[in-house]
Amino acid sequence: MASATDDRSVSTTRPMGDATRDAFGRALEALGADFPDVVTVDGDVGNSTRTEWFAKKYPDRAYNVGIAEANMVGVAGGLASMGKTAVTASFACFLLNNAFDQIRMAVAYPKQNVKLVGTHAGISIGEDGASQMGVEDVGLACSLPGVTVIVTSDGAQTRAATKAMLEHKGPVYLRLGRPKAPVIYDEGAAFEIGKSIRLREGGDYTIVANGMMVAMALDAADALAKEGIECRVVDMHTVSPLDEQALVDAAAETGGVVVAEEHLAQGGLGSRVAQFLSATTPTKMGFVNIGDTYGESGDPAGLLEKYGLTPEKIADSVRSLRG
């Protein structure tokens, strides 16, 4: 049975690279000298979120408040009010759920320069089970006005997004995964908050995805091309704010849009895309997500298969639009 750190923990033909949490940790450590106002606030899980790499290099800029996520976010908000760029990280389920009131009142409402980093997101964390799986985190973050929400797909993009996050003034939620991620981008590939990336051209349908589902979207598009169905693939890494022009173009120029994400059906990328397109450029839509349910313990590949987060399910969703 594959473990959550095995190279082949997701179903894709693409080579595997760094886990996005690892890429974030190394990027933060490397960027410390360029961003002297950055501090980290940890909830005693820095060895898992990888903030400990920054803390070991800059111990006088790192704070550990213990297993107390609400207090952790409050401290981060206070540091930001004193001019610091506060990076605070925990498992996605604990950060967004346990500290939501503090995120709302100490970060989002006052527009503090706090960077919230949720690791171990989705069901792909594997054996740890439902209590540890952040499957509603994007929806919670997107519900807060003014919070930028980013979901990266591979190591190279995460390194670029970490730098962009530190440069951005205001609250950011960065969602990261536990397992190794399929390689999508070359090192140094351009990344701009709020600007999606078109990875594949196609005039029949569009697949919009983020996170590890980007690799599966590309695999699905390759499979569909063999059937004569050409799909555009868009990496919508920023969930809030959406790249609205890319969505209008997709709806106007192709025959329908399928949204794939490792998140609950409600509140995440699919909900936001559907809400926007229904009001601006109505089109046929399909959705591939976890559904309206919690996860369970199991190996990552098996869980992704069970919950329908596969290239095959994405391809099936595209085919369903043809009727």
Pin down the residues of each PLM region.
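Thiamine diphosphate
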Residues: M1-R175, K180, A190, ...
